[in-house]
């Protein structure tokens, strides 16, 4: 990955609210299935904004920090996804998205961020991200002192 796109907590909340507004009316949804781990925080934000209390997870492992690897399903939510929103933080190459579509063919699959290779696999997303860009999510970063450039 050649570029980095840094996401702040404020940005994430703004994007999640935009997505939630597009998912109204909330009564059409039975619940949310958050893709662990990237979809957990966006899933909580959507649950809050839409007033949805039924939240489940599908646990899929496909990254080791910044390296993509083979997909492993560790835990899945029951059913075919009918009436459910499935949320992940982003769709990248589409590997996870294909697995989600296979597991939950009737779900409404959404992400906050989408790269070109994965865009056709989601029903909705908020922000376009170039394919060669790594996204730094706020839950992966800490706040630290940065000395002034002048050194004084």
Swiss-Prot record:
Q: State the disulfide connectivity.
A: none
PROSITE patterns hit by this protein: PUR_PYR_PR_TRANSFER
| A GO molecular-function annotation | magnesium ion binding
Binding-site residues for xanthine, renumbered to this chain: 92, 135
Transmembrane parts of this sequence: none
What keywords tag this UniProt record?
Cell inner membrane, Cell membrane, Glycosyltransferase, Magnesium, Membrane, Metal-binding, Purine salvage, Transferase
List cofactor names only.
Answer: Mg(2+)
Q: Which InterPro entries match?
A: PRibTrfase_dom, PRTase-like, Xanthine_Guanine_PRibTrfase
Q: What does this protein do?
A: Purine salvage pathway enzyme that catalyzes the transfer of the ribosyl-5-phosphate group from 5-phospho-alpha-D-ribose 1-diphosphate (PRPP) to the N9 position of the 6-oxopurines guanine and xanthine to form the corresponding ribonucleotides GMP (guanosine 5'-monophosphate) and XMP (xanthosine 5'-monophosphate), with the release of PPi. To a lesser extent, also acts on hypoxanthine.
Q: What is the designated name of this protein? A: Xanthine-guanine phosphoribosyltransferase
